[in-house]
């Protein structure tokens, strides 16, 4: 967050830019809490707390905008890098207990197959995120690529509950942090567009 942005927030705390920045902070804390809670719940229940698609999409998005297009994430850059490392911890815990989630299937018989599955899906999503950034520009690609991550995270969580038939691997903290972060991130995007922080007619 630049010194100019901070001064504007102090001068106009209820402006679109100020509210957007405060919502970004809320989203940053919320998602970090969500990822840490997923690591804990996965270890405690010995069952992945996140499905394949949202985890792989998240890691691909974070890799793209933390290391390939860091300028597109602006002052989110440091946060996205923190999320990337937190997600590697989530991935490690997930791969450790993923065979329990795939028991009775060919994938569940070999951890190596699961590693290849996750690697392939991450690579596919990374290619998609890169194409999105090239087509729309980094600024819009950052936000719309993140929106895809949020959609998959929420919908796949519901899918896990329905297919598993129990709440192991899930918790109120995970769901609550995700809901708050999603709401904060969506409204922050709207505020960025309104304030002009995210251009809607040019590539970055």
From Swiss-Prot:
Q: Where in the cell is it found?
A: Membrane
* InterPro entries recorded: PaxB-like (IPR039020)
Where is the signal peptide, in residue numbers? none
- Print the keywords alphabetically: Lyase, Membrane, Transmembrane, Transmembrane helix
Q: How does it sit in the membrane?
A: Multi-pass membrane protein
Q: Name one GO cellular component term.
A: membrane
Q: Which domain of life is it from?
A: Eukaryota
* Protein's UniProt keywords contain Transmembrane helix: yes
**Which terms in the Gene Ontology molecular function aspect does this entry carry?**
lyase activity
Q: In which pathway does it act?
A: Secondary metabolite biosynthesis; terpenoid biosynthesis
- Phenotype of null mutants: Impairs the synthesis of austinol and dehydroaustinol.
| Gene Ontology biological process | terpenoid biosynthetic process
Entry's transmembrane regions: 19-39, 49-69, 75-95, 114-134, 138-158
Indicate whether Lyase appears among the record's keywords. Answer: yes
Task: Look at the named UniProt entry and state the broad enzyme category this protein falls under.
Answer: lyase
What the protein does?
Terpene cyclase; part of the gene cluster B that mediates the biosynthesis of austinol and dehydroaustinol, two fungal meroterpenoids. The first step of the pathway is the synthesis of 3,5-dimethylorsellinic acid by the polyketide synthase ausA. 3,5-dimethylorsellinic acid is then prenylated by the polyprenyl transferase ausN. Further epoxidation by the FAD-dependent monooxygenase ausM and cyclization by the probable terpene cyclase ausL lead to the formation of protoaustinoid A.
Its family remark reads:
Belongs to the paxB family.
Additional facts recorded: In A.calidoustus, the austinoid gene cluster lies on a contiguous DNA region, while clusters from E.nidulans and P.brasilianum are split in their respective genomes. Genetic rearrangements provoked variability among the clusters and E.nidulans produces the least number of austionoid derivatives with the end products austinol and dehydroaustinol, while P.brasilianum can produce until acetoxydehydroaustin, and A.calidoustus produces the highest number of identified derivatives.
Q: What is this protein called?
A: Terpene cyclase ausL
Q: Which organism is it from?
A: Emericella nidulans (strain FGSC A4 / ATCC 38163 / CBS 112.46 / NRRL 194 / M139) (Aspergillus nidulans)
